[in-house]
């Protein structure tokens, strides 16, 4: 079963993670932010598989997002995505935390 999930697209995993862990647990405004983060993942890394997320892939994602956003917005995006990634690490879907030592940039 783990193999199935590691081959899963990261944007699909993130969407499922929102539904499982955030739906009905956060305010609607916050949920809107999680959904917007999902839309950006679909736009920036539509083919990235969960198993392929490493520090370089994650930093490239942040850099692409930072090209169009202020630093604080990039920090918020990072925190939302990091939550899903840390759960994937805890669940054994990816071997280590690729968000460690991420550099937060912005316009």
Please identify what each model-predicted range represents.
Residues 2-11, 18-93:
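N-terminal core-binding DNA-recognition domain of tyrosine site-specific recombinases/integrases
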Residues 57, 98, 106:
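Ca2+-coordinating acidic residues in Ca2+-binding motifs
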Residues 102:
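Substrate-binding beta-hairpin/strand module that engages nucleic acids
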